[in-house]
């Protein structure tokens, strides 16, 4: 099925839910979410109530599960994911999550997330992180990095202590909410793990009040957590682990001084875990200064995901919208993300797409945080098929229903391109990346191909659906008749 369309395209009004210009809403086969979008945001906002009911649940569960019982029979497992997966996540050593001697309650949360076996980055990271050693890990986007650090982080928590014991720092507010949600879900059987998400753009007073209650894990953006530390409300003197997710961005010029200021407030015996797809010189410098004999993991024989097929279409600026319209009508889009190079172009393009009759949300950094949160959760829950955005949405955002990424504006940097196309083909699945290239972009195209060691091919007149549509494959990878 191609993208949902109306017979008489009109510009739809502003949604009362998220203030987006959009055409008719057609629920796609997006990833399921627990509860409504509003419920999810409230859950992430209220650290004092997060998992507060889990203690009773875990206690009742543990009273049922006895040594020798087949405890896996009690699990509420999600439907098995039968989509084909690439070697980015299947090329493992054959380990099982049980091999790491994890708490049974943590294993229950892992399996109920649908995580059947550890991915390569999880196999490499989990035992080392459990030993307390610093880690410098380089792995592709969408290969399970969040699980690689959240599993050992949760295993090492001591719930008898009512203090912050672990901190995860991420570069964007949306990624903080996403990681928080994963942490909450994985730890739901552990009996009272308190997770707090704190980001800029939200009420500082609310965060201060929530820190009066017990918090074990903080997921934060750099500026907000430093502010809370300086005010003396975020007590970090008992932190045993700090994780820098998307470390290359966190240690760029935008954040590096803030990160330095955060690190010096932590205990000297803290464990530092760095995860990223790219490691520029700034990361190497930080590693030399702050990591103690780190265990280095490099799973990057190539930079781009194996499951993402890349094409370019040579167009003039005036032809871009027409080309996009053609792609919408010919591609079998589950969900798509469309990138522009400025906030203004994002809004203009979203308006154009809505006028063409396609359902469309947009998101960029200049929007109010409340609207950004709503758009993120609505799109994640499959309420809209297409999302137009800036590079705000390139970092770590994991929406596995996205099978098509379109660079309406081609990026100038190879790093930006790498993170953009990594929004499709998540966790070893198949995806498509299409780049609209103008005359002025041709040198950037060649440069990015050379830097990433990849080939971006001219778009064919017809694209084989088996390259990006999961239904055309069985689990064994054989094409369906």
From Swiss-Prot:
Record motif Q motif, residues: 95-123
Biased composition regions of type Polar residues, renumbered to the chain: 41-51
Keyword Disulfide bond in record: no
Localisation: Cytoplasm, P-body; Cytoplasm; Nucleus
Composition bias, Low complexity: 52-63
Gene Ontology MF annotations: ATP binding; ATP hydrolysis activity; RNA binding; RNA helicase activity
Ranges spanned by the short sequence motif DEAD box, renumbered to the chain: 245-248
Any one Gene Ontology BP term: stress granule assembly
Reactions that this protein is recorded to catalyse: ATP + H2O = ADP + phosphate + H(+)
Keyword Secreted tagged: no
SMART domains referenced in this protein's UniProt entry, alphabetically: DEXDc, HELICc
Domain annotation Helicase C-terminal: ranges: 307-467
InterPro entries with a match to the protein in the record: DEAD/DEAH_box_helicase_dom, Helicase_ATP-bd, Helicase_C-like, P-loop_NTPase, RNA-helicase_DEAD-box_CS, RNA_helicase_DEAD_Q_motif
PROSITE patterns per record: DEAD_ATP_HELICASE (PS00039), HELICASE_ATP_BIND_1 (PS51192), HELICASE_CTER (PS51194), Q_MOTIF (PS51195)
Segments forming domain Helicase ATP-binding: 126-297
UniProt main location, coarse: cytoplasm
Keywords: ATP-binding, Cytoplasm, Developmental protein, Helicase, Hydrolase, Nucleotide-binding, Nucleus, Ribonucleoprotein, RNA-binding
Binding site for ATP: 139-146
GO cellular component: cytoplasm; nucleus; P-body; ribonucleoprotein complex
Enzyme Commission code(s) on record: 3.6.4.13
Disordered: annotated span: 1-72
Subunit structure and binding partners: Component of a ribonucleoprotein (RNP) complex, composed at least of cpeb1, lsm14b/rap55b, ddx6/Xp54, ybx2/frgy2, pat1/P100, eif4enif1/4E-T and eif4e1b. Component of a ribonucleoprotein (RNP) complex, composed at least of elavl1/elrA and/or elavl2/elrB, igf2bp3/vg1RBP, ddx6/Xp54, ybx2/frgy2, lsm14b/rap55b and, in a subset of RNP complexes, stau1/staufen. Component of a ribonucleoprotein (RNP) complex, composed at least of lsm14a/rap55a, ybx2/frgy2, ddx6/Xp54 and eif4enif1/4E-T. Interacts with lsm14a/rap55a.
Family: Belongs to the DEAD box helicase family. DDX6/DHH1 subfamily.
Function: ATP-dependent RNA helicase that is an integral component of messenger ribonucleoprotein complexes (mRNPs), storage particles that mask maternal mRNAs from the translational apparatus during oocyte maturation.
UniProt protein name: Probable ATP-dependent RNA helicase ddx6
């Amino acid at each position: 099925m191609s993208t949902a369309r109306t017979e008489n395209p009109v510009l739809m009004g502003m949604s009362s839910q998220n203030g987006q210009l959009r055409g008719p809403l057609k629920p796609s086969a997006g990833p399921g979410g627990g509860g409504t979008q509003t419920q999810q945001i409230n859950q992430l906002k209220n650290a004092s109530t997060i998992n507060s009911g889990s203690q009773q649940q875990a206690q009742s569960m543990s009273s049922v599960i006895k040594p020798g019982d087949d405890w896996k029979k009690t699990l509420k497992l999600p439907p098995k994911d039968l989509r084909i997966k690439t070697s980015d996540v299947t090329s493992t050593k054959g380990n099982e999550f049980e091999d790491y001697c994890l708490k049974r309650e943590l294993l229950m949360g892992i399996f109920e997330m649908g995580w059947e076996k550890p991915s390569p980055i999880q196999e490499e990271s989990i035992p080392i992180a459990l030993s307390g050693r610093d880690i410098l890990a380089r792995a592709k986007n969408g290969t399970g990095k969040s699980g690689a650090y959240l599993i050992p982080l949760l295993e090492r928590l001591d719930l008898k202590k009512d203090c912050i014991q672990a901190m995860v720092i991420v570069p964007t507010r949306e990624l903080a909410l996403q990681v928080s949600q994963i942490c909450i879900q994985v730890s739901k059987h552990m009996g009272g793990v308190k997770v707090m998400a704190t980001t800029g753009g939200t009420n500082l007073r609310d965060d201060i009040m929530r820190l009066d209650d017990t918090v074990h894990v903080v997921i934060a953006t750099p500026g907000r957590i430093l502010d809370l530390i300086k005010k003396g409300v975020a007590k970090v003197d008992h932190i045993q682990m700090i994780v820098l997710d998307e470390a290359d961005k966190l240690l760029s010029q935008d954040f590096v001084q803030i990160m330095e200021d955060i690190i010096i407030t932590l205990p000297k015996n803290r464990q530092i875990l760095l995860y990223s797809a790219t490691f520029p010189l700034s990361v190497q410098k930080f590693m030399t200064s702050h990591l103690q004999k780190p265990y280095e993991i490099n799973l990057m024989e190539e930079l781009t995901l194996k499951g993402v097929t890349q094409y370019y279409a040579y167009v003039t600026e005036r032809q871009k919208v027409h080309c996009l319209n053609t792609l919408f009508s010919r591609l079998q889009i589950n969900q798509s993300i469309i990138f522009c190079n400025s906030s203004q172009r994002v809004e203009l393009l979203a308006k154009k797409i809505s006028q063409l009759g396609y359902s469309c949300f947009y998101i960029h950094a200049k929007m109010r945080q409340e609207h950004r949160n709503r758009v993120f959760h609505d799109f994640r829950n499959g309420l809209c098929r297409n999302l137009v955005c800036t590079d705000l949405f390139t970092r770590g955002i994991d929406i596995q229903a996205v099978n098509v990424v379109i660079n309406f504006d081609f990026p100038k940097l190879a790093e930006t391109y790498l993170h953009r196309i990594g929004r499709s083909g998540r966790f070893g699945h198949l995806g498509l990346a299409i780049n609209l290239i103008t005359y002025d972009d041709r040198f950037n195209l060649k440069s990015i191909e050379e830097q990433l060691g990849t080939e971006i091919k001219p778009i064919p007149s017809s694209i084989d659906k088996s390259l990006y549509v999961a239904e055309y494959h069985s689990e064994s990878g054989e094409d369906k008749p």
